[in-house]
Amino acid sequence: MTQEILGEVQTGKIPLKGRTLKELSEIMVSLGEKSFRAKQIYHGLYVNRYESWEQFTTFSKTLKEKLEGLCSLTQLTVVKHLKSVDGTQKFTFASEQGKEFEAVWIPSGDGGRKTICISSQVGCTLNCKFCATAKLEFQGNLKAHEIVDQVLQVEKIVGDNATNVVFMGMGEPFHNYFNVIRAASILHDPDALNLGAKRITISTSGVVNGIRRFIENKEPYNFAISLNHPDPNGRLQIMDIEEKFALSELLQAAKDFTRELKRRITFEYVMIPGVSMGPENANKLVKIARSLDCKINVIPLNTEFFGWRRPTKQEVAEFITLLEPAGVPILNRRSPGKDIFGACGMLASKS
């Protein structure tokens, strides 16, 4: 049994959500049970969506009582549920320790695409000037079961299954790499939630050592970089991560990703008038886009309460026109859920 699991045995019940099948097998054997019980539990949690031991009807009463005493099927508590006029729904969850974080259900206009935006941390270690989460006190990383359970609880409440999951909620995913990748593997596993790897997107603000690890491990998931400015000095003014990981280093890692994994990367770009827009910034962004296989998602600023304003539709259209010489796909990403503080950059447990 791993040191992590041993520690949990000593401090209380072992949470079984967020475990790989191999880890569940180790736990069952350590408890004196046959390893095949692990697959039954795994299937029960993620396919049947069981939430209590009583639902495991193939288990004997003795086994259920034993597991009830030693293992936990803990689930997140929903402390707030808000619905937008556009169909977006925001969920504020509380962990067992009472720490709050958020996830968002985002259906497309035609209902064909249903995305859950999930959090990886409570608050964030970074200070992106346009992001409401950055203003919160950082309270720690989420464990894998707390990440996976966001998807399970949202799907249960809305009564529908997501077509896509994006790690773009609270926190920097690559500052919680192990738990994020473990959660993604459960979301992807055909014996669990069975989401295709291309339907799972992990985003980073530019943690280069995390990108290197992602490449080395040949992770199959979609990958996005929150770029937001094409110039190192300009980027430093709005993203403090530039102090640790320079833009040049980040772009080299992005090029290595596309070359070694032969997959396209997505650049997320928040449009802030007078800060990240205009012909000069557009030309620099075009140069970056031409240097590797990428697409660009442009996002009009949502957090106007930080002293900047949201670009007009005309300004957005003009900026996109300036980017067209890059010859890459450009998406003007809609940001639903503004009325419930559920849009991109707005997650901060506000209502």
Curated annotation (Swiss-Prot):
The active site is at E102 (proton acceptor), C344 (s-methylcysteine intermediate). Residues 110-339 form the Radical SAM core domain. Keywords: 4Fe-4S, Cytoplasm, Disulfide bond, Iron, Iron-sulfur, Metal-binding, Methyltransferase, rRNA processing, S-adenosyl-L-methionine, Transferase, tRNA processing. One of its GO terms (molecular function) is rRNA (adenine(2503)-C2-)-methyltransferase activity. Its cofactor is [4Fe-4S] cluster. Pfam families: Radical_SAM, RlmN_N. GO terms for biological process: rRNA base methylation; tRNA methylation. It is found in: Cytoplasm. [4Fe-4S] cluster binds at C124, C128, C131. Specifically methylates position 2 of adenine 2503 in 23S rRNA and position 2 of adenine 37 in tRNAs. PANTHER family: 23S RRNA METHYLTRANSFERASE, RADICAL SAM CORE DOMAIN-CONTAINING PROTEIN. Belongs to the radical SAM superfamily. RlmN family. NCBIfam families: rRNA_mod_RlmN. This is Probable dual-specificity RNA methyltransferase RlmN. It comes from Leptospira borgpetersenii serovar Hardjo-bovis (strain JB197).
